[in-house]
């Protein structure tokens, strides 16, 4: 190799007896190599010279001494780290800043570990257990009561009410009648079997009936119009000699004047006002 062949490719200075760098079969003095080829450090913005270690992550470069956690500033050299929003964080800082806390043990749920979510809270998989049997619930069905979560078998064993009709567990809601509880969809009219949830109803011998069935089967009938006398919503009725009338139906059988609060006479089965009953063969 001649002396000219041992010169810096860029500045042509002789490299005899000097340090140099060989790149792509070309020789460079240290000064030229650093100026032309050095990467710039993400942290300090200075060139990473040939005598320094260049640490690279996703086409970004750092001096070894600048490769630190963005929050606690501890070195990340040969340590696990996480990149978030262009920042490098050690696992401890990432966990404190970005990870969820377990609702049960209050410890950090580490990135990459499995976590369970329920009603906006998070648990370690091993902390998300049935309040009674302490077995992991995982993705199985569960029922919440007060501050605890229960697997279905434990909840049914400890707390559940059973429907008076179908004898199955009532997990939520329900209707109570005569100290018994029903599913909403099981509380039916004893006559026509329609659902009574959010409906007015009457009872007979401890059996519930919708108003139509109760009136048809059990309500007294008006002696005038023959329609049921329900007594609902404060309705008034008149009773005389085992007969009943709606107050608006208690009228003179001849002139139809109201007899409510008035004296009246009877003729056979007919009710008459005093005027119409005068001179007739009547009973007082």
Swiss-Prot record:
Span of zinc fingers (C4-type): 8-32
Localisation per UniProt entry: Nucleus
GO function terms (MF aspect): transcription coactivator activity; zinc ion binding
PROSITE patterns in UniProt: LIM_DOMAIN_1 (PS00478), LIM_DOMAIN_2 (PS50023)
Keywords, ordered alphabetically: LIM domain, Metal-binding, Nucleus, Repeat, Zinc, Zinc-finger
A Pfam family recorded for this sequence: LIM
Paired cysteines (S-S): none
Keyword Ligase recorded: no
Gene Ontology annotations for the cellular component aspect, listed alphabetically: nucleus; Z disc
Limits of the LIM zinc-binding domain: 39-100, 101-160, 161-220, 221-283
Stored InterPro entries: FHL5_LIM2 (IPR042947), LIM_FHL1/2/3/5_N (IPR056807), Znf_LIM (IPR001781)
Biological-process GO terms, alphabetical: positive regulation of transcription by RNA polymerase II
Assembly: Interacts with CREM (via the third LIM domain). Interacts (via second LIM domain) with SPAG8.
Function: May be involved in the regulation of spermatogenesis. Stimulates CREM transcriptional activity in a phosphorylation-independent manner.
Full protein name: Four and a half LIM domains protein 5
Species: Rattus norvegicus (Rat)
